[in-house]
Amino acid sequence: MKTKCICELCSCGRHHCPHLPTKIYDKTEKPCLLSEYTENYPCYHSYLPRESFKPRREYQKGSIPMEGLTTSRRDFGPHKVAPVKAHQYDQFVPSEENMDLLTTYKKDYNPYTVCRVDPIKPRDSKYPYSNKMEYLPTYKADYLPWNQPRRQPLRLEHKYQPASVRFDNRTTHQDDYPIKGLVKTVSCKPLAMPKLCNIPLEDVTNYKMSYVAHPVEKRFVHEAEKFRPCEIPFESLTTHKQSYRGLMGEPAKSLKPLARPPGLDMPFSNTTEFRDKYQAWPTPQMFSKAPITYVPPEDSMDLLTTVQAHYTYPKGVPARSCRPAPQIRKSGRFEGSSTTKDDYKQWSSMRTEPVKPIPQLDFPTEPLDCLTTTRAHYVPHPPINTKSCKPHWSGPRGNVPVEGQTTYTISFTPKEMSKCLASYPEPPGYTFEEVDALGHRIYKPVSQAGSQQSSHLSVDDSENPSQRKLEVSA
């Protein structure tokens, strides 16, 4: 028999199983075709979907197999490629003649006798001249001053005369916006109105009344297997050691050259070509004077240096210093004048008054009342409670037959009103089997005959106190 869930048993469209976002009960990987879109928007079989705008594939593959030749292979045929012949050089045959060991320098440059050159040293000027030198620089001799008249300045005539009135130190903002006192404002807060209803709000909903908490299975925890050490001893052999065994061969020979090749038993001469041709000159022995034995003086020390004792000032007066005398700073004003100071005198600066625009508005002297147009002209009115025109509920209507000959009464066929099977906690004729991975409650029919009898229920079954209606929010 085919199993059904609440979604399939419902005939009124208000009951369905909770569609869980994750498969908390799932232990298999089965695709779920139910989604929020397919649940809220059912498909209509009378409406055909529109055709796709995707272009159709009108290209048909040819039955002839394609050749494996490209344009390059067809146009460019292979050529015979011969290996490049390497150039063979002639075998080197050493000559039997002896090398003369002569260079171009030895042939072109003949040796000359070398002698010591006296040092070029300027003459010592031990005796300076006492006469004063008369000199005139080239600039003063070639460039003489001209006697030209003084140029007149090209500046404009000074016509600005500052105002003699004292500046009052007031701004435009201070003149136009004087300081005003505090203004008493009227509160716009509405008055406290009495509450129309003192009944507390009920927080009981259909979800709280009809919600049944399902037991959650215990989470499966994977236990890791315990580590079991290997009982076979470690042989320290790798795949490389087992597959590649070393073969016995000849021992390696040393390629190190001999410490002293044969034929070089002669001692090494430490003379070079430079040492043979350029011998050291005979240097005379330095004359050294024997030191005089020190005899301490018997008189007292005069504390005079050699310069003070042997060199006196000429004419008895010490030499004057050529350094200019330091200038004494004066606290007074410097009275030196120049062309710029004579032509450009310091102006007597005065603070200029700001250019104020002519006031075109007459501002009121009274303080601002801080009232808007709405506050000034709006008159508050007491709220008026309007009467409701909604008719009173006369209670549930009975199954009264429709009177009158109308198209509805003629064509209407009364049918027996059946109650939705999903509104019962346990649908009659079905037994609960399991809860799906997506949260669907699966029910299995008891028998084929019993399910047909239980599907046609009367309206009076709702009055049975043993069966309580299950309200599920759609």
From Swiss-Prot:
Entry's localization field: Cytoplasm, Cytoskeleton, Microtubule organizing center, Centrosome, Centriole; Cytoplasm, Cytoskeleton, Cilium basal body; Cytoplasm, Cytoskeleton, Cilium axoneme; Cytoplasm, Cytoskeleton, Microtubule organizing center, Centrosome
Region annotation Mn 7: where it falls in the sequence: 233-266
Chain residue ranges for the region called Mn 4: 132-165
UniProt-annotated stretches for the region Mn 6: 200-232
Mn 2: annotated segments: 65-97
Function: May play a role in the regulation of cilium length. Stabilizes microtubules at low temperature.
Family: Belongs to the FAM154 family.
Annotated domain remarks: The Mn regions are involved in microtubule-binding and stabilization at low temperature. They are required and sufficient for cilium targeting.
Protein name per Swiss-Prot or TrEMBL: Stabilizer of axonemal microtubules 1
Gene coding for it: SAXO1
